[in-house]
Amino acid sequence: MDITQIDIPIRFTDYQELNTKDQLSGGHTIGTTILNKEEAKRGIVEMLIQKNLPRIILCTIVIHELVHVWIFHHHLELPAMEEEGLCKFMEYLWLEKQATPLANVHMKLKHQNQCPVYGDGFRNTHSLYIELGSNIETLIARLKSKRSPK
């Protein structure tokens, strides 16, 4: 999942500005990535993250938003449920590596999330990962195979 050659401006902001910028979510947002999708100027405008978050939340948000950047950079045209599911799943893998009681709580919350896009998306991605032998490269290859032709 190489995105090391991309400049990604990250800006910490307050809740009000962040939620004003993210008009589409219709809910509480604590991180978002603003993209320029015009082919002539395609790129990452900036990543906005709410200020003063606890470490575990900050890390999962940065992971989540970096996965959106990776998906954008690789021109994947995934349905929202698959894209958000992959983002949530990558957060989950990081939480798993933390091996703390707090990380375990956040992992459990991902399984219990009732939102169709985020919760079902996560559970579908997690199930596919297990079905594919718990191999992240195979999971990514499967998602890449869905790339829209240009």
Regions found by a protein language model. Name each.
Residues M1-E46, N52:
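Auxiliary, metal-adjacent structural segments of Zn-dependent hydrolase domains
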Residues K41-V62, H74-L78:
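Short pre-active-site segment immediately N-terminal to the catalytic Zn-binding motif
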Residues M47-L48, E65-H68, Q112:
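Helical anchoring/docking segments at protein termini
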Residues K51-N52, V69, F89, L93:
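Intrinsically disordered, low-complexity, Ser/Thr/Glu/Asp/Lys/Arg-enriched terminal regions and linkers
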Residues R55-T60, A80, E84, C115-F122:
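Solvent-exposed, acidic/flexible segments
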Residues T60-H74, E84-K88:
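Active-site recognition of the HExxH zinc-binding catalytic motif
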Residues H75-P116:
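Post-HExxH zinc-binding segment in Zn-dependent metallohydrolases
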Residues M107-K150:
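Pan-zinc metallopeptidase signature
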